A protein has these predicted regions:
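Nucleotide phosphate-binding/pyrophosphate-handling subdomain across enzymes
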Residues: 38, 134-137, 145-158, 162-163, ...
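Glycine-rich phosphate-binding loop signature in dinucleotide/nucleotide-binding domains
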Residues: 127-133, 269, 320-325, 393-401
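C-terminal helical cap/extension that packs against the catalytic core
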Residues: 194-216, 230-234, 299-302, 308, ...
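Charged, amphipathic alpha-helical linker segments immediately N-terminal to NTP-binding catalytic cores
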Residues: 1-16
């Protein structure tokens, strides 16, 4: 088996026809020696901000001197990004070796595991093999029935900002979504919640009380944003002052406040995490594809906001960083998202749209998306490929700002096309 065939094997099994549940993951991990039982975790769920918060947690724990695993999805440029230890992606050779280990166990199962379940098993094997002190584990979808939820009670569960997304899988109300996310709360294990949505907060508080899990809600009244530019946003939170965060979205200090709150909970449980490590970890964190500046002048931004809740935060960041300016938007949206609300948020800031389809069957076609924009009074033209779309958006932008957004699934392709254009 080589790297390409290993990836082919991983991607061969999709969700279709599989009943949600943890039994397949448990069976697979048991056949592999239950590597997850040797590990300690911070488990992160939420609608938006969970990847950024997970990256911040991992960076701070590493700065405190721990060996830290980080498990996230989706990837931006290469699959290996999803499984990292101390900021280093799993090597191609190690990935191939672990797929060769997982394949016979997976193939022997009557109810074969899904792609995400196989990747979760690969992550657990790698984190155990590399002797991680702690793993920051990002949920794939929901919480209760997500394959990451096979773990024993974590050192801390973290629930980031909640909003309406994945309603088909999780349910049509915020209470349903909160209930799925609250599934990661384990008996006696502390939980940190971003809060701010009463309907969801009530569900999380009730679940935490039922499971005797100490709950801390992030106190955003202690957050002050001092300054923000195209290099960093400076903020104070709960006694930590003047932190320069290189993730420049206006919403990122709120994610940082969530991470700091969780790190202090870990500290109360005996983890040695001084404030100096929290500061260092936040000031050197990297998390591609989230309000990321690929070029300062003229501005070219890349953002992975993929639902109305995330788009609202991105639009606020655009208003904060570029007051009064109009953008050329390079846009791709999944057909199962709230296209109406996403377009309503973007149209007031748009001079022009260039639409593309990300390389996934869920993507709305470039033509359909352009028609939807025109029907709402916007100017839009479809591009046949992402490469053509990037070139066209840059040409239309001239000296003005361009922002590529709508899904994480095209971030890697946009970055590659933009780099090629600027060679």
């Amino acid at each position: 088996m080589n790297y390409e065939s290993a990836l082919e094997y991983i991607h061969a099994v999709q969700w279709a026809g599989h009943k949600p549940g943890l039994s397949r993951t448990r069976t697979l991990l048991a056949a592999l020696g239950d590597p997850h039982k040797k590990l300690r975790f911070v488990h992160v769920a939420g609608t938006n901000g969970k990847g950024s918060t997970a990256a911040m947690l991992a960076s701070c724990l590493q700065a405190a001197g721990y060996r830290v695993g980080l498990y996230t999805s989706p990837f931006i440029n290469r699959f290996n990004e999803r499984i990292q230890v101390n900021g280093e992606q799993i090597s191609d050779d190690a990935l191939v070796r672990l797929v060769e280990q997982v394949q016979p166990a997976a193939d022997a199962m009557q109810d074969v595991p899904t792609e995400f379940e196989i990747i979760t098993a690969l992550g657990m094997l790698w984190f155990a093999e590399t002797k991680c002190d702690i793993v920051v584990l990002e949920v794939g979808l929901g919480g209760t029935l997500d394959s990451t939820n096979v773990i024993d009670p974590p050192e801390c569960a973290v629930i980031t900002a909640l909003g309406m997304d994945h309603v088909k899988e999780l349910g049509p109300t915020l209470a349903d979504i909160a209930s799925a996310k609250a599934g990661i709360i384990k008996p006696g294990s502390p939980v940190v919640s971003y809060g701010g949505v009463p309907e969801a907060d009530a569900v999380i508080a009730r679940t935490a009380a039922e499971r005797h899990a100490p709950l801390t809600v992030v106190d955003l009244s202690r957050l002050t944003i001092e300054d923000g530019d195209l290099d960093a946003v400076t903020f104070d939170f709960d006694g930590l002052n003047g932190i320069r965060l290189p993730l420049i979205g206006s919403y990122q200090p709120r994610n940082a406040a969530t991470a700091i709150t969780a790190l202090r909970v870990l500290r109360s449980r005996g983890w040695n995490i001084p404030d100096s490590a929290i500061r260092a970890g936040l000031e050197q964190v990297r998390w591609p594809g989230r309000f990321e500046l690929l070029r300062h002048s003229p501005v070219f931004l890349l953002d992975g906001s993929h639902n109305a809740h995330g788009m609202r935060a991105t639009v606020q960041s655009l208003r904060d960083r570029f007051p009064g300016q109009k953008f050329v938007f390079l846009l791709s949206i999944m057909a199962d998202k709230d296209v109406d609300e996403m377009l309503a948020l973007l149209l007031p800031l748009a001079g022009q749209f260039v639409t593309v389809a990300a390389h996934t069957p869920r993507a709305m076609s470039a033509e359909t998306l352009a028609e939807q924009i025109r029907a709402r009074g916007g100017r839009a033209e479809p591009a046949s490929t992402i490469e053509a779309g990037v070139a066209r958006a840059v040409a239309l932008g001239g000296t003005g700002p361009v922002c590529a957004l709508g899904t994480l699934y095209f971030s890697g392709d946009v970055r590659e096309a933009f780099a090629k254009l600027n060679q």
